Regions:
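TOPRIM metal-binding catalytic domain and adjacent DNA-binding surface shared by DnaG-type primases
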Residues: 1-56, 235-236
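Intrinsic-disorder-associated interaction segments
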Residues: 5, 20, 75, 93-96, ...
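Phosphate-handling DNA/RNA-contact segment within nucleic-acid enzymes
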Residues: 45-173
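TOPRIM fold recognition
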Residues: 51, 68, 114, 134, ...
Length: 236
């Protein structure tokens, strides 16, 4: 069903490098951190791994050579492929088996905490644990690329406008969180994520803000195209 759990052989990884978003070395580093996989048909697998290291699911996506999504090929969940592989076409049985998801990159929270804890014990003059700030974007592609350009943040991705929910922000509650929604002409994404942020703040006391960067800086034409942070920063 897929060749390996980790790798840079997907069309996505090749496109990221060939279009100048990352160097080969940066792509290798990002692929290892995010544990990118590759399917047998060349799709990239964005594994969703929680803070315990458990793989909850994986999203298989397809990209064109210009590093934009191949809209002729719909994203697929690994869990759905497995269900159909083992259960055939039993629609009712497949529908009865739940799937669980988290933000793409959630496992980085645990790795960050371990690194910071090591720093604490290596410096006898300081015993305070400082966690990294977390940036949440919509697309996995955006998180992967910006993680190499702005490493001061831990970059996580919701995987879609409506995939961001307050409960998925619970593991982030001890971090400062900045949400970077995509832009659009009607403030739909910003408004939606603002409401999610408010709910997370109410439920978990999250230190969370929604960045207005794209709403304040994007041109009307860019908003019409519904650009994201990578589109704006690279202006390709």
């Amino acid at each position: 069903m897929w060749q390996q759990r980790l790798g840079t052989a997907s069309a996505f990884c090749r496109a990221v490098v060939s279009n100048g978003y990352l160097t080969e070395a940066q792509m290798q580093h990002a692929a290892q951190r995010y544990r990118l996989g590759v399917s047998r048909d060349g799709g990239v697998i964005f594994w969703q791994i929680d803070t315990t290291g458990s793989i909850l699911d994986g999203k298989i996506m397809y990209y064109r050579p210009d590093c934009h999504r191949d809209h002729k090929r719909h994203p697929q969940w690994v869990s759905n492929r497995l269900k159909h592989y083992y259960l055939g076409d039993d629609v009712e049985l497949i529908a009865s088996i739940p799937s669980y998801h988290c933000l793409f990159g959630t496992h980085l929270l645990m790795e960050d905490a371990r690194c910071k804890m090591a720093d604490v014990f290596s410096q006898t003059s300081s015993f305070r644990l400082h966690t990294s700030d977390v940036a949440v974007v919509e697309a996995e592609k955006t998180a992967v690329i910006l993680s190499e350009h702005y490493p001061a943040y831990l970059w996580l991705a919701a995987g879609g406008l409506f995939e961001l929910t307050a409960d998925k922000l619970f593991p982030l509650r001890h971090h400062r969180i900045v949400l970077f929604p995509d832009t659009d002409p009607n403030l739909t994404a910003y408004t939606r994520w603002y409401e999610v942020a408010r709910e997370a703040r109410r439920l978990y006391g999250c230190n969370i803000t929604v960045s207005p960067l794209l709403e304040l800086s994007a041109t009307p034409e860019q908003k019409q195209r519904k650009i994201d942070l990578v589109d704006y920063l690279f202006k390709k």
